[in-house]
UniProtKB/Swiss-Prot annotation:
Enzyme Commission (EC) number: 1.6.5.-, 1.7.1.17
Keyword flag Acetylation: no
Molecular functions (GO terms): electron transfer activity; FMN binding; oxidoreductase activity, acting on NAD(P)H as acceptor; oxidoreductase activity, acting on NAD(P)H, quinone or similar compound as acceptor
InterPro entries, per the entry: Flavodoxin_fold, Flavoprotein-like_sf, FMN-dep_NADH:Q_OxRdtase_AzoR1, NADH:quinone_OxRdtase_FMN_depd
Record's subunit section: Homodimer.
Annotated FMN binding sites: S10, S16, Q17, S18, M94, Y95, N96, F97, T138, R139, G140, G141
Family per record: Belongs to the azoreductase type 1 family.
Protein name, UniProt field: FMN-dependent NADH:quinone oxidoreductase
Catalytic function, reaction form: 2 a quinone + NADH + H(+) = 2 a 1,4-benzosemiquinone + NAD(+); N,N-dimethyl-1,4-phenylenediamine + anthranilate + 2 NAD(+) = 2-(4-dimethylaminophenyl)diazenylbenzoate + 2 NADH + 2 H(+)
CC cofactor note: Binds 1 FMN per subunit.
PANTHER family xref list: FMN-DEPENDENT NADH-AZOREDUCTASE 1 (PTHR43741), FMN-DEPENDENT NADH:QUINONE OXIDOREDUCTASE (PTHR43741:SF2)
Protein role: Quinone reductase that provides resistance to thiol-specific stress caused by electrophilic quinones.
């Protein structure tokens, strides 16, 4: 049975287009027997903003403050959750040409040297291997494969850096360019989801 971690990151909650699409995916995959864990990074599961004290504490050490230890424990739990699942589904609405702050914050909590990646004499090596990722990205305009799409290249780079190179991307484009364009973008995204196996 496939285990799936879904990361929601829209600040619009249930009103967001990315939430609509990921709920569509969840409904299909649950019917196929997948066990799905949802983490709402912009809702009930919002993470603290990583600051200097937290970043220093995530490196570990013998003398951590109480807050640093709490944040290190949280990071360890997030990494364990990531590693425990077979597929990671990331919803990423485009905000000002990039990913939501809440999603970037999750990345900062799980991207840890010696834990999710390591440095070797041949360069960095990801330690979260044998996983698959699905990116569901929603945009008001049309950005796919263009110079204004900084999201998908960034997310693929991050995932590859920690060892996840099997990545599918679902695009929902031009959602704010009129009712017809919105309907077309959502329909095409759902068609892409229909082609994905658990």
């Amino acid at each position: 049975m496939s285990k799936v971690l879904v990361l929601k990151s829209s600040i619009l909650g249930g009103y967001s287009q990315s939430a609509l699409l990921v709920d569509y995916l969840i409904g299909k995959w649950e019917k196929q027997g997948a066990t799905i864990t949802v983490r709402d990074l912009a809702g009930k599961d919002v993470l603290p903003m990583v600051d200097g004290e937290i970043a220093s504490g995530l490196r570990g050490g013998a003398e951590l403050t109480a807050r640093q230890q709490e944040m290190l424990d949280l990071s360890n739990a997030l990494v364990e959750e990531l590693k425990a699942n077979d597929t990671i589904v990331i919803t990423a609405p485009m905000y000002n040409f990039n990913i939501p702050t809440q999603l970037k914050n999750w990345i900062d909590f799980v991207a840890r040297a010696g834990v999710t990646f390591t440095y070797t004499e041949n360069g960095p090596k990801g330690l979260v291997e044998g996983k698959r990722a699905v990116l569901i990205t929603t945009r008001g305009g049309a950005h796919k494969d263009g110079p204004t799409d900084h999201m998908v290249p960034f997310l693929k780079t991050f995932l590859g850096f920690i060892g996840i190179t099997d990545v599918d991307v679902v695009y929902a484009e031009a959602l704010n360019m009129g009712p017809e364009a919105n309907q077309k973008g959502i329909s095409e995204a759902k068609a892409s989801i229909d082609k994905l196996a658990v």
